[in-house]
Regions:
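Core catalytic ATP-binding domain of two-component histidine kinases
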Residues: 1-166
Length: 166
């Protein structure tokens, strides 16, 4: 499931986009969550739809918040990444090359492999009824594919989760 949306791709200064959302992201969290931004000062320009990127970042931050009901630490990070053929060969349509990475890391409840393997499925959610549609990650997956990028999840139960968007 990755319904194609019309994308308005353009050159995006990722750090500027993240900083412009800082207040909104902070307000999305509760006081028990420490919020940190680690933005690479020499970040390359990304090619993406800025509105879809904002939506993706907000979704990831809300998911991270929900994984830390008792509080914790949430980090939004940007960095330059070179994806080599050894990595991209496992992902059809992902070309080797230079990418800007946006990641959201939390030290919340984490996810077992059985959840990670279904996380991008539409309507799949582990949240209580009425608290999640199960569409956030599937929309991010569709956006990343349509943008010729990639999204990955690294998670450990009781340790936390990092979602990386390239």
């Amino acid at each position: 499931f990755s319904r194609r949306q019309s994308l308005d791709s353009k050159a995006v200064q990722m750090n500027s986009l993240v900083l412009s959302m800082g207040e909104l992201l902070q307000r999305s969290l509760n006081e028990s969550i420490q919020f940190e931004m680690r933005l690479d000062e020499k970040l390359w320009v990304a090619e993406a739809d800025p509105n879809q990127l904002e939506s993706a970042l907000l979704n990831l931050v809300i998911n991270a918040r929900d994984a830390m009901p008792e509080g914790g630490k949430l980090v939004v990070e940007t960095s330059n990444q070179v994806l080599h053929r050894e990595f991209t060969v496992a992902y059809p349509n992902l070309e080797p090359g230079d990418y800007v990475m946006l990641s959201v890391t939390d030290n919340g409840c984490g996810m077992p492999q059985s959840v990670i393997s279904r996380a991008f499925d539409p309507f799949f959610t582990t949240k209580p009824i009425g608290q999640g549609t199960g569409l956030g990650l599937s929309m991010i997956y569709g956006f990343s594919k349509q943008s010729r990028g990639h999204v990955s999840i690294d998670s450990e139960v009781d340790q936390g989760t990092t979602v990386r968007l390239y």
